[in-house]
């Protein structure tokens, strides 16, 4: 009979098969009450799961992220149950857990309204009060297909029909509502008391624009009311900081229907872009990278050799010319190998660091596009390092140090790191994987960095490190990547002459620090709420005259500051100075400079810092000294 090992190392022995719920009860009444699900030998299961042999067990409660995910998954089913009670003709499709919440897609004859959302949430609360048991049932696949067809749930029947015929499927029943799901779920709807439906959207069935547009309902669920309130407050702040809204308000960029997923950068937005790109360009140049430029449109044959045509052709923009098929490049790596292959390379030439701010195009589904965060045309701070196996650790360590410096300069110091190791299906010898994984781990440890290990999550062609930064709202953005590649140099014939005079394939390190510049600038806009530090600000200051008599002096000030290298504008309109100050405050400029008769006579300016701080009168020399200090330290008012 089963001996059950708990996370603290203790073992509980039973003389009969036992459920997860019974094990929890044997430990204590408090745990029995708090238990939501379990994890048996690494597999998440319901409390009703019966353990028949020796196993390792962890009881999941709402104190763990995994337990909260069970709550969210169950709340998605609660949402579907409520929709079916209120709108019986609606068909259910899928309802996964996502970061901080969940969604469920429905097929219905009309779009849901905000009033519908309120009614659905109210019905969900009623279902919670009923404390309906949530029970798992296992059916033969064909029986499940027939059942869902019989009740008019054709999408669900289609999903189940794609499962092999000899497999059983698990269903969950709560009251009259039955849904397909692997589970696990909470034992009763009464455990789902803290939730909120947040928004409505459209989504194509299976993400294909040729299919029906479904109604997507988003929601969030938490263990405690305080957690929900904190999250909703964060959403309010995020709404205020929405880069799309600030992009219009600050005259940075726009996107229009004639070019979906492609950005029209306005003068101020392009100035911001240039500050980011020029900083990155200067930084990588100082660290030994050679910047290159490769074609936008490349013959299909290269993409077939690289393997991208088979994997990415649906996401490629293609064209034809003179009976040849071409693709607008979705990434730079195959083209960089073409440069590497020009001329014989020796081990003495390695490591070779090749960078490109390459413009890439990917035909992302229209429903996934989001401002400048998710686009079809983007530029990456892309680079590839060609090196020997022995050089991997040193190159990885240098890149990690560089990445930390860049993130810190942009104001991000909280970085999360994940190391993904070999998957079951892979290329390359185990010895090469052993060395590569050890090199990446050693590079991280050399920097004193903690990381999360993700066994089996690496690409088939090499292990990788992912770097995510946390913004001022504690949102996590995955930006940086260091991906080892044992495959592409072999496929595209990249070779070098080794020290023993034999030809070998280099290891290729794909690396990016900020990733898509468009997305990173969107992150910056939201992180700073549009109030950029001086070094990034599109306009450093505006000079405003109090009356017409100071117009010439205001112009002199603008010219002097521009000659000193600053981005300064003049506002010489015949408007009251307080009106000008209020208007430019909306534009979030770091500084406002006011000149009246006193300032003109003394050859100074009255300086107001963003946020309203009054620095009084400063000479232009003092102001330039202050600004140069802020630029050098990449600081300034935020």
Swiss-Prot record:
UniProt-listed Enzyme Commission number(s): 6.1.1.3
Q: Where in the cell is it found?
A: Cytoplasm
Q: Which intervals of the chain are annotated as region Catalytic?
A: 242-533
The coenzyme or cofactor needed here is: Zn(2+)
Presence of the UniProt keyword RNA-binding in the record? yes
Q: Supply one GO molecular-function term.
A: ATP binding
Residue ranges of the TGS domain? 1-61
Per UniProt, the cofactor note for this protein states: Binds 1 zinc ion per subunit.
* Family membership noted in the UniProt record: Belongs to the class-II aminoacyl-tRNA synthetase family.
Subunit architecture: Homodimer.
NCBIfam families reported in the protein's UniProt record? thrS (TIGR00418)
Name of the featured protein: Threonine--tRNA ligase
Source organism per entry reads Azoarcus sp. (strain BH72)
**What gene is this protein a product of?**
thrS
């Amino acid at each position: 009979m089963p001996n059950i090992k708990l996370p603290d190392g203790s073992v509980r022995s039973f003389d009969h098969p036992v459920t997860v719920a019974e094990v929890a009860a044997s430990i204590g009444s408090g745990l029995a009450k708090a238990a939501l699900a379990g994890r048996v030998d690494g597999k998440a299961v319901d409390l009703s799961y019966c353990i028949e042999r020796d196993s390792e067990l962890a009881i999941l409660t709402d104190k763990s992220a995994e337990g909260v995910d069970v709550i969210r998954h169950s709340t998605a089913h609660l949402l579907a149950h409520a929709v079916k009670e209120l709108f019986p003709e609606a068909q259910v499709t899928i309802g996964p857990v996502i970061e901080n919440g969940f969604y469920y897609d429905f097929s219905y004859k009309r779009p849901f309204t905000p009033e519908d959302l309120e009614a659905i949430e109210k019905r969900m609360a009623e279902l919670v009060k009923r404390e309906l048991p949530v029970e798992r049932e296992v059916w033969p696949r064909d029986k499940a297909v027939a059942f869902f067809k019989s009740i008019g749930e054709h999408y669900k029947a289609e999903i189940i029909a794609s499962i092999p015929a000899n497999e059983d499927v698990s269903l969950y029943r709560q009251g009259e509502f039955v849904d397909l799901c692997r589970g696990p779920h909470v034992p009763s709807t009464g455990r789902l008391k803290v939730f909120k439906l947040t928004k409505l959207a459209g989504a194509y069935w299976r993400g294909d624009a040729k299919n029906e547009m479904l109604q997507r309902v988003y929601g969030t669920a938490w263990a405690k009311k305080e957690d929900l309130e904190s999250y909703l407050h964060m959403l309010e702040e995020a709404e205020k900081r929405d880069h799309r809204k600030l992009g219009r308000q600050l005259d940075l960029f726009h996107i229009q229907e004639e070019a979906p997923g492609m950005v029209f950068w306005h003068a101020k937005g392009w100035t911001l872009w240039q500050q980011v790109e020029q900083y990155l360009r200067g930084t990588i140049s100082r660290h030994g990278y050679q910047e290159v430029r490769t074609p936008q449109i490349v013959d299909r044959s290269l993409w077939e050799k690289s393997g991208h045509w088979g994997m990415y052709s649906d996401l490629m923009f293609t064209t034809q010319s003179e009976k040849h098929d071409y693709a607008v490049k979705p990434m730079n790596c195959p083209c960089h190998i073409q440069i590497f292959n020009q001329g014989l390379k020796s081990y003495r030439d390695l490591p070779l660091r090749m960078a490109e701010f390459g413009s890439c195009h990917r035909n992302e589904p229209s429903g996934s596009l989001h401002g400048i965060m998710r686009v079809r045309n983007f530029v990456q701070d892309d680079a590839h390092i060609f090196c020997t196996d022995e050089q991997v650790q040193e190159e990885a360590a240098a890149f990690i140090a560089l990445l930390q410096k860049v993130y810190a300069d942009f104001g991000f110091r909280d970085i999360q790191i994940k190391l993904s190791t070999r998957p079951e299906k892979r290329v390359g010898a185990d010895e090469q994987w052993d060395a590569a994984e050890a090199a990446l781990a050693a590079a991280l440890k050399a920097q004193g960095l903690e990381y999360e290990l993700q066994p089996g999550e690496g690409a088939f062609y090499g292990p990788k490190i992912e770097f995510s930064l946390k913004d001022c709202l504690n949102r996590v953005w995955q930006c940086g990547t260091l991906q080892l590649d044992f495959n592409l140099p072999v496929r595209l014939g990249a070779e070098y002459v080794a020290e023993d005079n034999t030809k070998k394939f280099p290891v290729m390190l794909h690396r990016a620090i900020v990733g898509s510049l468009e997305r990173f600038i969107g992150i910056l806009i939201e992180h700073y709420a549009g109030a950029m530090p001086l070094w990034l600000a599109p306009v450093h200051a505006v000079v405003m005259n109090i009356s017409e008599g100071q117009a010439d002096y205001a112009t002199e000030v603008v010219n002097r500051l521009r000659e000193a290298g600053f981005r300064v504008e003049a506002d010489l309109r015949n408007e009251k100075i307080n009106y000008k100050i209020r208007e430019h405050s909306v534009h979030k400029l770091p500084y406002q400079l006011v000149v009246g008769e006193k300032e003109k006579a003394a050859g100074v300016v009255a300086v107001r810092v963003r946020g309203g701080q009054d620095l009084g009168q400063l000479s232009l020399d003092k102001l330039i000294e202050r600004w140069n200090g802020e630029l050098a330290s990449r600081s300034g008012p935020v």
